[in-house]
Amino acid sequence: MTTKSKILVIDDEGAFCEFVKWSLEKTGRFEVIVSTDGPSGIARAETEKPELILLDIRMPRMNGAEVADHLLHREDTRDIPIAFITGLLNKNDVQKRSGYIHGFPFIIKPITKKELVEQVDSVFEIITTQKNFIASLDA
């Protein structure tokens, strides 16, 4: 039996979180955990240890940059890859930057189920490539 990749979605839009959860879990390859604000998302990241965090940029109380900063400065969460989710940019802006801004992959809202799955798969391919490269350096 293949283990499912665990993804934590931190986004204040409950309907979007449910869309992501349904879309990714329907593939049978992902287990999706949802948190609707920054502080609870940080707590879930610390306890659940996901393989990827999908993090909204604009949220009340604590925005995505603040959440990412907190996670990146904690020993137990700093190695968890983060992909930002935003409706603040358009697809052309992100494509000009090859899908990355300041080293983080971006997923643009609104998004279709097919696009979401493709982009999450792409992020996991990058994660795997990075892990394999680091392992080859240690060998």
Predicted segment positions?
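Active-site residues of response regulator receiver
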Residues: 11, 56, 86
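Charged docking surfaces used in two-component/phosphorelay signaling
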Residues: 18-26
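Short hydrophobic/Thr-rich beta-strand motif most characteristic of the beta2 strand and flanking loop
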Residues: 29-36, 44
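Active-site beta3 strand of CheY-like receiver
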Residues: 48-54
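CheY-like receiver
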Residues: 125-139
